[in-house]
Amino acid sequence: MMTEYTSRKLTWKDYLVVASLLFGLFFGAGNLIFPLHLGQLAGANWGTAAVGFLITGVLLPLLSVLAVAITHADGVYDIGKPLGAGFAVVFMVLIHATIGPLFGTPRTATVSFTVGMAPFLPKNMQGTALLVFSALFFLAAFAFSYHQNNILSNVGKVLNPLFLSLLFLVFVVAFARPLGNPQTAAVTSAYKHGALVNGFLEGYNTMDALAGLAFGITVVTAVRGMGQKDAKSVSKVVAKSGLLAVLAIGFIYLLLILMGAMSLGRFKVSDNGGVAFNQIVNVYGGVFGQVLLAFLLTITCLTTAVGLVAAFAQDFHKHFPQVSYHAWLALSCLASFLAANFGLDTIIAWSTPMLMFLYPLSMVLILLSVFSPLFKTDGVVYFFVILFTVVPALGDMVVAFPSVVSQSSFGLAVASLRNHLPLANMGLSWLVPALVGLVVGLVVHFVKTKKVASVLEED
């Protein structure tokens, strides 16, 4: 029998707090800079590009949260478990390494520094300044996530509302005094005919679908701390709160993309969205605006960093319990600090190939998890879909590497083979093989199920 505490009915305020936690964990460095840059690249085609971006940047993260809820999973490991413990561990390590200390977490520090602080510093001081800034940044992330039960209050109740207030102020000023007409903005060549697909691929850079799987354990821990102990109650809270969070994120994405397209009335396409954001804020607020931007970026990046290092430590402590949560937390923060000092450009250049590999695998696993009740979570369906997806995804990864790999004899050979696959020129060479794998897996599943039913009838 559940106690009165465990059966406590949550109020709408409780759902909003969990949604705020999810929002804060999802919405980080890339969520500000990539949609803004997309708006500049797409110009007048910003609407079509936005649809593609919202599929991978909003719909897929929502499905990842629903996958956690439907399967009663605690984290990445459980999502991959139908394929066996070995695959689940490898998948968990790859996801956490990518969104964690290798790329995602270091990016939170480098974006906030590059956009928020670097403009105020001479170039010869930026290396040392990044070293000091990233050290302080990850010390703060360590402190906020040190006590697991405080993550909800620290992120959902303190940092996130402050960030939303600052972002709202930026939107009010930008749309009250627009820099240009988005309908007449110039369109870059890639977005003249491929706005939808390019927007779809640009959504990979947010890493939110991967983050949704990784944050599962953090959110589940927080919800259980609110008195929801049984799996059904936890799943219900996660699903409802997840919907609220991604709807808010989607609305902000649209505003950022539109703001990027409007900025072309005053500026050329920038090197990245961080530079564009800095330019826009500087027009409206001058030095004060830049200081506000520095503070805003640091807040949003810190909220994401807290979630990433906590999720890394929680998942790894769960599966490797001989090492404490705090030791994993310290390792994550230290590794992220070291990676951050390679700089933003290096991090982005080397993260793209991993995303081209992991996103297709994550997409199919998320969709399989959501629809798993239809085929009773049969591992054979998972096996064939992943088998047919992993090879072309590896090809996409090799082609996306910097030229030292992609232009090598090996890279060129892989690219030549990959070009024979449908949709390869769009970066979606995995899609048709994945569908073929799904058909094969379902056929095997239903044939196997029918045989078992026949045997039972004979008995």
Go through each PLM region and give its residues.
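TM-loop-TM module centered on a large, flexible mid-protein loop between adjacent transmembrane helices
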Residues: G75-K81, I252-L302, V309, K318, ...
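Hydrophobic, membrane-embedded alpha-helices of multi-pass small-molecule transporters
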Residues: L16-F27, A97, F137, V173-G180, ...
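Membrane-water interface regions at transmembrane-helix termini and the short interhelical loops
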Residues: V68-D78, L136-L159, G225-Q228, F337-W350, ...
